[in-house]
Amino acid sequence: LSEQDAPEVPPQAVIIAGPNGSGKSTCSVALLTQFVEFVNADLIAQEITGHTRAGADIGAGRLFLEQIERLARQRRDFAIETTLATRSLADRIVQWRRDGYRVHLVFLWLPSADLAVQRVAFRVRSGGHSVPESTIRRRFTAGLRNLFRIYIPIVDTWRVYDNSRGADPVLIASGVKDGPVKIAEPDAWRGLLQEYCS
């Protein structure tokens, strides 16, 4: 095949998701070495000066969505980080897939909101950004519910990892759109389904 006869490689969108404190930013560095375009609302918020934290978060959310829309229009590969606590990405994911993107979801799970709160507190003591405890707890539950009810059904591939041990994440389960679920950790997977799918 000549270069012009070769099939076009579809653009890729990778979503690194999980509760606050789950290690999304840390894992992103290892997982996304090939992605030049990595969009992170927390990093955008840190760059916004002259605003309250709430004002910076709102501005960062707007800029985050603008950046990913620009990249999608340009059909560039990109990766983003999110808690999945809202359904704000759902329509975009459907549109990206309609536009020829392959969308991959990696979810970093923690077994409790308490652990998420502890990890964020540790991050703050180490100089990282803070998130109010009530927000961490709300996002923890909402993100897991949305993972199962909204996001797994609309992406091309997905993987859920246990990232509670502080070392390498442990694969719990994975799948492809409309395909079978491959379960690596049956007890953890069963617990997630019972808690967030019923």
PLM feature segments, named:
Residues 149-198:
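NTP-dependent small-molecule kinase module
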Residues 101-150:
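A glycine- and Lys/Arg-enriched "phosphate-lid" helix/loop adjacent to the NTP-binding pocket
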Residues 56-110, 143, 147, 151, ...:
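Glycine-rich phosphate-binding loop used to anchor ATP phosphates in small-molecule kinases
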Residues 26-76:
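Conserved substrate/cofactor phosphate-moiety recognition/catalytic segment
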Residues 23:
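Conserved glycine(s) of the Walker
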Residues 7-14, 74-76:
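Pre-Walker A (Motif I) flank of P-loop NTPase domains
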Residues 1-7:
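Pre-Walker A adenine-sensing motif
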Residues 19-20:
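The conserved Walker
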